[in-house]
Every structure is written in structure tokens, then in C-alpha cells.
From Swiss-Prot:
Family label: Belongs to the purine/pyrimidine phosphoribosyltransferase family.
Name used for this protein in its record: Adenine phosphoribosyltransferase
PANTHER family: ADENINE PHOSPHORIBOSYLTRANSFERASE
InterPro entries: Ade_phspho_trans, PRibTrfase_dom, PRTase-like, UPRTase/APRTase
One Pfam family in the UniProt entry: Pribosyltran
Gene this protein is translated from: apt
Quaternary structure and partners: Homodimer.
Record-level GO BP terms: adenine salvage; AMP salvage; purine ribonucleoside salvage
Length: 170
């Protein structure tokens, strides 16, 4: 299946000069959505995953069906003020300024094998902060999976030596 057929390209969104890759058409097609999730599940099967972690909001959309198929739990990564219990934080650099991500402080147990799933790998800031959060709790990141990588933004450099899978490159 050619997954790029299910990605809408929107010029100058959310601001001038940006090309937005919209996964909504992929999610709206049951066969394409299932195919994408299954590709990530197949990547993860031999990694002995204990937990899937996904950053809001589209990491939830991809990560939850993957966790379900693997028979493991899902832990959300959110912006500050969105989780009701004690959290840990990781701050990362963006193009203009910084941003912070949080997780419940008991989301990951020491030694748990974690797969991080998100829709898009762009600059790598979100994935780097998510890796930091997992490792602060003693988790072991055994892989990262993305629907899309924007190659020119070089986000893979922030992943370093972590194993990862990308379904589509732009």
C-alpha cells in the first residue's frame, strides 16, 4: 500500500512557508490506518516491548492501536498542566524558544522496554524530550516509530543511536 496517497499536503499552514503533512485522510481510511499501525507493530514485535509511549496528540492516535495490538500499556506525554498527578518534565529547544513535555512520574517502571511512537519526526525536539522522560524513570528505549519523517529537518540526528522506523519520507 502506498501510504503517501493518504497524506494531504497543505501549503503555508500553520504559517507562511510551512508545508503541513496532514494524516487525517490516513486515519479516515480503515485499511490505510490499519496498515500503518500494523507496519509499526511488525517492527516492534521482536523488541519485547513492555510499554508504548506517545506524545500528544497524534502520538496517541498512532501509539494506542500499536499498544493494543502488542498487548501492552500506553503512557501519554503531554504539555504542562494536562496530567492530573505528579509529573516529571523535560524541556527542549524549538526554533524560537523552548517547550516542555511531561509524563506521570510513575508511568514507566525501571527496566521497562519502551517503544516511542509519533506521527512525525521533524526537528527531533519532541522525540529527544520524550526519550529523556522515559530514561529519567529508568525505562529503556528500544525503538522509535514514526509515520512520517521530514528529512531536510534532520530530526534523526536527535535520535542518535536509538533504533527507529519511518513509514514515509518527505
Amino acid at each position: 500500500m502506498e501510504l503517501k496517497d493518504y497524506i494531504a499536503t497543505i501549503e503555508n499552514y500553520p504559517k507562511e512557508g510551512v508545508v503541513f503533512r496532514d494524516i487525517s485522510p490516513l486515519m479516515a481510511d480503515g485499511n490505510a490506518y490499519n496498515y500503518a499501525a500494523t507496519e509499526i507493530v511488525q517492527y516492534a514485535r521482536d523488541k519485547e516491548i513492555d510499554m508504548v509511549v506517545g506524545p500528544e496528540a497524534r502520538g496517541f492516535i498512532i501509539g494506542c492501536p500499536v499498544a493494543f495490538a502488542l498487548g501492552v500499556g500506553f503512557a501519554p506525554v503531554r504539555k504542562p498542566g494536562k496530567l492530573p498527578r505528579e509529573v516529571i518534565e523535560a524541556t527542549y529547544e524549538k526554533e524560537y524558544g523552548t517547550d516542555t513535555l511531561t509524563m506521570h512520574s510513575d508511568s514507566i517502571k525501571p527496566g521497562q522496554r519502551v517503544l516511542i511512537v509519533d506521527d512525525l519526526l521533524a526537528t527531533g525536539g519532541t522525540i529527544a524530550a520524550t526519550i529523556e522522560l522515559v530514561e529519567k524513570m529508568g525505562g529503556v528505549v528500544v525503538g522509535c516509530a514514526f509515520l512520517i519523517e521530514l528529512d531536510e529537518l534532520k530530526g534523526r540526528e536527535k535520535i542518535g543511536n536509538y533504533d527507529y522506523k519511518v513509514l514515509m519520507h518527505y
